[in-house]
Amino acid sequence: MKFSSIILLTLLICSMSIFGNCQVETNKKCQGGSCASVCRRVIGVAAGKCINGRCVCYP
């Protein structure tokens, strides 16, 4: 439950962002390419990529 509330809070802050370039960094390691399956599980959207060895999702 705690993890879900953190994600919801992050999405709320992102939706209030003036610039709209919010991202959700995960602890899931990756090696290049897409993180679509991870982002779909974490925030329900398949928009994400591997940055510095970690999946980063964009709502």
UniProtKB/Swiss-Prot annotation:
<feature type="modified residue" description="Pyrrolidone carboxylic acid">
    <location>
        <position position="23"/>
    </location>
</feature>
<comment type="similarity">
    <text>Belongs to the short scorpion toxin superfamily. Potassium channel inhibitor family. Alpha-KTx 15 subfamily.</text>
</comment>
<feature type="signal peptide">
    <location>
        <begin position="1"/>
        <end position="22"/>
    </location>
</feature>
<dbReference type="GO" id="GO:0015459">
    <property type="term" value="F:potassium channel regulator activity"/>
</dbReference>
<keyword id="KW-0732">Signal</keyword>
<dbReference type="GO" id="GO:0005576">
    <property type="term" value="C:extracellular region"/>
</dbReference>
<dbReference type="InterPro" id="IPR001947">
    <property type="entry name" value="Scorpion_toxinS_K_inh"/>
</dbReference>
<keyword id="KW-0800">Toxin</keyword>
<keyword id="KW-0872">Ion channel impairing toxin</keyword>
<comment type="function">
    <text>Blocker of A-type voltage-gated potassium channels of cerebellar granular cells. May also inhibit Kv4/KCND when coexpressed with DPP6 or DPP10. The occlusion of the outer entry of the K(+) conducting pore is partially reversible and affects both open and closed channels. It shares the same target in rat brain than BmTX3 (AC Q8I0L5) and AmmTX3 (AC P60208).</text>
</comment>
<keyword id="KW-0964">Secreted</keyword>
<protein>
    <recommendedName>
        <fullName>Potassium channel toxin alpha-KTx 15.5</fullName>
    </recommendedName>
</protein>
<dbReference type="Pfam" id="PF00451">
    <property type="entry name" value="Toxin_2"/>
</dbReference>
<dbReference type="GO" id="GO:0090729">
    <property type="term" value="F:toxin activity"/>
</dbReference>
<feature type="site" description="Basic residue of the functional dyad">
    <location>
        <position position="49"/>
    </location>
</feature>
<feature type="disulfide bond">
    <location>
        <begin position="35"/>
        <end position="55"/>
    </location>
</feature>
<keyword id="KW-0873">Pyrrolidone carboxylic acid</keyword>
<keyword id="KW-1015">Disulfide bond</keyword>
<keyword id="KW-0632">Potassium channel impairing toxin</keyword>
<dbReference type="InterPro" id="IPR036574">
    <property type="entry name" value="Scorpion_toxin-like_sf"/>
</dbReference>
<keyword id="KW-0528">Neurotoxin</keyword>
<feature type="disulfide bond">
    <location>
        <begin position="39"/>
        <end position="57"/>
    </location>
</feature>
<dbReference type="GO" id="GO:0008200">
    <property type="term" value="F:ion channel inhibitor activity"/>
</dbReference>
<feature type="disulfide bond">
    <location>
        <begin position="30"/>
        <end position="50"/>
    </location>
</feature>
<feature type="site" description="Aromatic residue of the functional dyad">
    <location>
        <position position="58"/>
    </location>
</feature>
